[in-house]
């Protein structure tokens, strides 16, 4: 059997990338002008047999940056009151500094080289996180500047569904629509969905690659 067929480590599975599941809730669609209000992150790990699973969860309510737009339609959609003192919101710097610190530790521990965002319709979440990191002057951003794993695309391929709730249900997972549009809940569901898609491909024999497929 080839050496490649024995690879079960996280660093081997994604070409040295360390996948981190992210979801954000915002006050609009423009990452440069609209507020980031909530962010959750879940790191992933692999067991000794190469099965992917969620690992560490981080979750923060975020204070709107100075001068941020707060679109009423977006707030009505996600139900967030940015002025609610019970949110326990922190600055963009505090939230991302803690997430990046945990992610960098995970990269080192797993032998990976760089983090890659996993998200549902990932361009949206990626743009908001990157804009917030720039505003916060966080220089050591561990995430790839543009590459992502988009579970909307992956679920469309693997399950024939692109909506998060429908993809989860098709995969045999629970999805509580009353908890949707919470960054924490959506991140948890996205993490389990991504793991299921990756593990399903393994169960079907798609990974590890056969000797004939090795480059």
Swiss-Prot record:
Effect on the protein of changing residue 13 to A: Strongly reduces affinity for RNA. Nearly abolishes enzyme activity
Cofactor(s) the record lists: Mg(2+)
Disruption phenotype: Required for optimal growth. Significantly slowed cell growth, increased expression of sodB reporter construct.
Enzyme class name: hydrolase
Annotated binding of Mg(2+) 2, by residue: 23, 25, 181, 186
EC number(s) recorded for this UniProt protein: 3.1.13.-
Keyword annotations of the record: Exonuclease, Hydrolase, Magnesium, Metal-binding, Nuclease, tRNA processing
Keyword Hydrolase tagged: yes
InterPro entries (alphabetical): Exonuclease_RNaseT/DNA_pol3, RNase_T, RNaseH-like_sf, RNaseH_sf
Result when mutating residue 181 to A: Nearly abolishes enzyme activity
Occurrences of domain Exonuclease (ranges): 20-194
Textual note on the cofactor: Binds two Mg(2+) per subunit. The active form of the enzyme binds two Mg(2+) ions in its active site. The first Mg(2+) forms only one salt bridge with the protein.
Outcome of substituting residue 108 to A: Strongly reduces affinity for RNA
Keyword Lyase in record: no
Result for mutant: residue 73 to A: Reduces enzyme activity. Abolishes enzyme activity
Reported impact of residue 150 to A: Nearly abolishes enzyme activity
Domain of life: Bacteria
Other remarks on this protein: Member of the DEDD group of RNAses that are characterized by the presence of four acidic residues in the active site. These residues are conserved even when the proteins have highly divergent sequences.
Family statement drawn from the similarity comment of this UniProt entry: Belongs to the RNase T family.
PANTHER family: DNA POLYMERASE III SUBUNIT EPSILON (PTHR30231), RIBONUCLEASE T (PTHR30231:SF2)
Known function: Trims short 3' overhangs of a variety of RNA species, leaving a one or two nucleotide 3' overhang. Responsible for the end-turnover of tRNA: specifically removes the terminal AMP residue from uncharged tRNA (tRNA-C-C-A). Also appears to be involved in tRNA biosynthesis, especially in strains lacking other exoribonucleases. A general regulator of small RNAs (sRNA), contributes to their degradation. Upon overexpression suppresses sRNA-mediated RhyB-silencing of multiple RNA targets; overexpression leads to nearly complete loss of RhyB sRNA.
Protein name: Ribonuclease T
Organism: Escherichia coli (strain K12)
Gene designation: rnt
């Amino acid at each position: 059997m080839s050496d490649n067929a024995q690879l079960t480590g996280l660093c081997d599975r994604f070409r040295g990338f360390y996948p981190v599941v992210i979801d954000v809730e915002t006050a609009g669609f423009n990452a440069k002008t609209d507020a980031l209000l909530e962010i959750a992150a879940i790191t992933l790990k692999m067991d000794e047999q190469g099965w992917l699973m969620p690992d560490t969860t981080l979750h923060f309510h975020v204070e709107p940056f100075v001068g941020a737009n707060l679109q009423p339609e977006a707030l009505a959609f996600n139900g967030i009151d940015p002025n609610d003192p019970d949110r326990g919101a922190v600055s963009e710097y505090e939230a991302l500094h803690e997430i990046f610190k945990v992610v960098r530790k995970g990269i080192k521990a797993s032998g990976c080289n760089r983090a890659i965002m996993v998200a549902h319709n990932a361009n949206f979440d990626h743009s908001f996180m990157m804009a917030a990191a720039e505003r916060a002057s966080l220089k050591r951003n561990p995430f790839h500047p543009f590459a992502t794993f988009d579970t909307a695309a992956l679920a469309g391929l693997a399950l024939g569904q692109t909506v998060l709730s429908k993809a989860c249900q098709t995969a045999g997972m629970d999805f509580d629509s009353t908890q949707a549009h919470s960054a924490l809940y959506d991140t948890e569901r996205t993490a389990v969905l991504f793991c299921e898609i990756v593990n399903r491909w393994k169960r079907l024999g798609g990974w590890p690659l056969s000797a004939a497929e090795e480059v």
